[in-house]
């Protein structure tokens, strides 16, 4: 490294909102750079910059203006162009707020309205008029459940990776608690089958779909292990499974939607549990080593 070292202090940038693509409020970069412009010194945090401001002591300009008062038309255009997904969700909030306050609630004497049932009414009529086809699709669906269960179990028993198994345990336990807590009525047009899972056409919890959540957990693990083709097959089968469940009235749309979210959520929680366990194990080993060094 060259002996010639220069210290560069960037000035305080005053831009109201970090989402506008420019510098954030109150970020001062105080670093030391060598001749090749490589940083070799520390970077001050935003909180340190706030503490180092030397105005009138009461906050001054820092608190005199709210963030929105510094927004410009350029900022609004930038957000609309580069952050269109949050803008789309904002429009969705406004739209469904209007919908929620203008629609009448479904009477207690009526069956719940389900948009998925409306979309699959043609499939429902076909399956209702063809019990053999319904039985074949139910058997294929049960095979898919067996495939995902086998895969999730093998990730732990064969490959020694417990994350997917832990996620499935979390997911089915939570599903049992929620399903028992709120026992939704079975749809009147339900088309059962003796080979469907749960086998024997027994009673089952509707909220949420364990079929869909289990397939999501298996698919996420496949993608994590870069088994992308197998994951794509599972995703396609999961979509077909969801359509079949709606067509047979085996689940409401909300059960399937939450099943997708539950698979993602519990896979993430299982990953955090693994990280926490590894961190605890490392800390335990370090404490044991330090104890041994003190004894010796």
UniProtKB/Swiss-Prot annotation:
According to its UniProt record, the EC number is: 2.7.8.-
Q: Name one GO cellular component term.
A: membrane
TM regions (residue ranges): 83-103, 136-156, 165-182, 198-218, 250-270
Q: Which GO terms describe its molecular function?
A: diacylglycerol cholinephosphotransferase activity
What the protein does? Functions as a phosphatidylcholine:diacylglycerol cholinephosphotransferase that catalyzes the transfer of the phosphocholine headgroup from phosphatidylcholine (PC) to diacylglycerol, a major reaction for the transfer of 18:1 into phosphatidylcholine for desaturation and also for the reverse transfer of 18:2 and 18:3 into the triacylglycerols synthesis pathway.
Please give the family membership noted in the entry: Belongs to the phosphatidylcholine:diacylglycerol cholinephosphotransferase family.
Q: What is this protein called?
A: Phosphatidylcholine:diacylglycerol cholinephosphotransferase 2
Organism from which the protein derives: Arabidopsis thaliana (Mouse-ear cress)
> Taxonomic lineage of this organism?
Eukaryota, Viridiplantae, Streptophyta, Embryophyta, Tracheophyta
